[in-house]
Amino acid sequence: MGGVTFIGGGSFGTALAIMLAKKGHNVVIWDRNKEILEDINTLRTNTRYLPNNIIPCCVKAVDDIEKAAKESKYIVLAVPSFAIREVCRKIKGFLREDQIIISIAKGMEEETKKRLSEVVKEELYKNPVVVLSGPSHAEEVANDIPTTVVVTSTDMKYAEEVQDVFMTNSFRVYTNSDIVGVEIGGAVKNIIALASGIGDGIGYGDNTKAALMTRGMSEIMRIGVKLGGKPETFFGLTGMGDLIVTCTSMHSRNRKAGILIGRGMSCREACDKIGMVVEGVKACHTFYELKESLGVSMPITTSLYKVLFENGDPKKEVYELMARDKKNEYYF
């Protein structure tokens, strides 16, 4: 048994499916939305999430999740963070122990405050779990734009195996043994990207964006180290790299949602306008509660929480951030 199955037919999963099909892998996509599956099989494109790319004929879309789960050695969980536990429960009865589970979502489980790999391992405890993360917008991956990411696992032999599967001439994959740092960086950067987008929407300039990104990185490091991550991980691809691309790219849905909020929309209105999951919203709620319980300073996250969930005024929150007591830049 070989090949790669994607549980979820969103933009990033579809982009990776295209890339792997070009490499010669047999690829299967399952999604609960049958219109997506029909488009893939008949039009050879994902009209909803990645409409400008042709999907190779060796990619099959199926509506039978049992068939999809049994088809391949590598099972990629390509669904939003809130759906991870649900899809694990759907496929757990169909898996064999030699199948490797690959998580590509970025976030935390809101109710339990657990990292997504922890959630996967709880449900699929017989299977090895690998996390793939990094600065990798779907629109660029699908078009073979040079991209670098990281794979990590609690057992690095599985990360190295997945590294071999996903490596191409345009998609370079590094290994990193710090699974905690990799996942925390990928989750918290969405919070900072939302804040950065709000600054853009208000009309602030490059100075503000630079401040949000660098001070945001301090918040990522503080909470990440507190949760067990290594400081150096946050200066790598899944920390600084992912933060840069998410805060600056025209493809970033978190930044785009932030822009709309900065221009006067409510959080709900902005998310509805984007039409896809904005992971930074749930992440902000999760990490606001985490930093409160752990006693970690995260002022940008706190201000964003007030804007998203307490109808705070974005400009007032920026003023409050700027008016805080003076500090050393490197307080930890």
From Swiss-Prot:
Residues where sn-glycerol 3-phosphate binds: 106, 134, 136, 189, 242, 252-254
Active site: 189
EC number: 1.1.1.94
InterPro entries assigned: 6-PGluconate_DH-like_C_sf, 6PGD_dom2, G3P_DH_NAD-dep, G3P_DH_NAD-dep_C, G3P_DH_NAD-dep_N, NAD(P)-bd_dom_sf
Metabolic or biological pathway, per its Swiss-Prot or TrEMBL entry: Membrane lipid metabolism; glycerophospholipid metabolism
Single annotated GO MF: NAD binding
Principal location: cytoplasm
Record GO biological process: carbohydrate metabolic process; glycerol-3-phosphate biosynthetic process; glycerol-3-phosphate catabolic process; glycerophospholipid metabolic process; phospholipid biosynthetic process
Top-tier EC class: oxidoreductase
Localization, UniProt: Cytoplasm
Functional description taken from the UniProt entry: Catalyzes the reduction of the glycolytic intermediate dihydroxyacetone phosphate (DHAP) to sn-glycerol 3-phosphate (G3P), the key precursor for phospholipid synthesis.
PANTHER family: GLYCEROL-3-PHOSPHATE DEHYDROGENASE, GLYCEROL-3-PHOSPHATE DEHYDROGENASE [NAD(+)] 2, CHLOROPLASTIC
Homology family: Belongs to the NAD-dependent glycerol-3-phosphate dehydrogenase family.
Record's protein name: Glycerol-3-phosphate dehydrogenase [NAD(P)+]
Organism of this sequence: Clostridium acetobutylicum (strain ATCC 824 / DSM 792 / JCM 1419 / IAM 19013 / LMG 5710 / NBRC 13948 / NRRL B-527 / VKM B-1787 / 2291 / W)
High-level lineage: Bacteria, Bacillati, Bacillota, Clostridia, Eubacteriales
